[in-house]
Structures are given as C-alpha cells and as structure tokens.
Amino acid sequence: MVPFEYYVALSGLLMVLGFIGVIIRKNIIAMLLSTELMLNAVNIAFVAFDMKLHDVVGQVFVFFILTIAAAEAAIGLGLIIAIYRMKKDVDVEKLTELKG
C-alpha cells in the first residue's frame, strides 16, 4: 500500500502546479483547467486524510467538490464561449473592460 505521505505530497504538488497555471497563463481556458487541477488536488488530500483517519467524511466532501467543480466548469465554459463570441479572443490581457 502506498504511504499516506505520498498522497499528501502529490496533492501539494498538484496544488502548486494549478496555482502556477492560474498565475502564469493568460488564456482563460487554461486558467479554468488549472483551477480544476487545484480542486482535484484538494480531493486527493481529502481521500488521503480519510484513509489515515478511517472516516467516510472525506469521501462525502469529495462528492460535493466534484459536483461543484462540474457546475463551475459548465458555467465557466459558457462564459468563455460568450466572451469569445463578443471579443473573438480569450486572452486575459486583452479583456480589460467589463461592460458590454
């Protein structure tokens, strides 16, 4: 069986990679994917601590987070498509105005 610390290290690494992706990327789609990566890192951490503590609460939180992540992805992609139809670009630096 894989040790608990490996799961926590993997979770931390994925969280850092997702955070760097949100900070560095200029494309909204890449930023959305990086956010999803961070949410999955949290899921791995919840399951790892759930294994360590022998409790089911972590798995329940994972189901809630997956539901929220799916809704976030659907709404985010809808907004990105609407922005692309109006501006013909999804680069964050070119999207400076919030009014239509």
Swiss-Prot record:
Gene3D superfamilies in UniProt: 1.10.287.3510
EC id: 7.1.1.-
Protein's cellular compartments: Cell inner membrane
Superkingdom as given in the UniProt entry: Bacteria
Bilayer topology term: Multi-pass membrane protein
Reaction(s) the record says it catalyses: a quinone + NADH + 5 H(+)(in) = a quinol + NAD(+) + 4 H(+)(out)
GO cellular component, as recorded: NADH dehydrogenase complex; plasma membrane
A GO MF label: NADH:ubiquinone reductase (non-electrogenic) activity
Pfam families with a match to the protein in the record: Oxidored_q2
Keywords associated with the record: Cell inner membrane, Cell membrane, Membrane, NAD, Quinone, Translocase, Transmembrane, Transmembrane helix, Transport, Ubiquinone
Enzymatic class: translocase
InterPro entries: NADH_UbQ_OxRdtase_chain4L/K (IPR001133), NUOK/Mnh_C1-like (IPR039428)
Residue intervals passing through the bilayer: 4-24, 28-48, 61-81
Signal peptide coordinates: none
GO biological process: ATP synthesis coupled electron transport
Oligomeric and partner information: NDH-1 is composed of 14 different subunits. Subunits NuoA, H, J, K, L, M, N constitute the membrane sector of the complex.
Similarity-based family: Belongs to the complex I subunit 4L family.
Cited function: NDH-1 shuttles electrons from NADH, via FMN and iron-sulfur (Fe-S) centers, to quinones in the respiratory chain. The immediate electron acceptor for the enzyme in this species is believed to be ubiquinone. Couples the redox reaction to proton translocation (for every two electrons transferred, four hydrogen ions are translocated across the cytoplasmic membrane), and thus conserves the redox energy in a proton gradient.
Protein name listed in UniProt: NADH-quinone oxidoreductase subunit K
Annotated source species: Sulfurihydrogenibium sp. (strain YO3AOP1)
Upper classification of the organism: Bacteria, Pseudomonadati, Aquificota, Aquificia, Aquificales
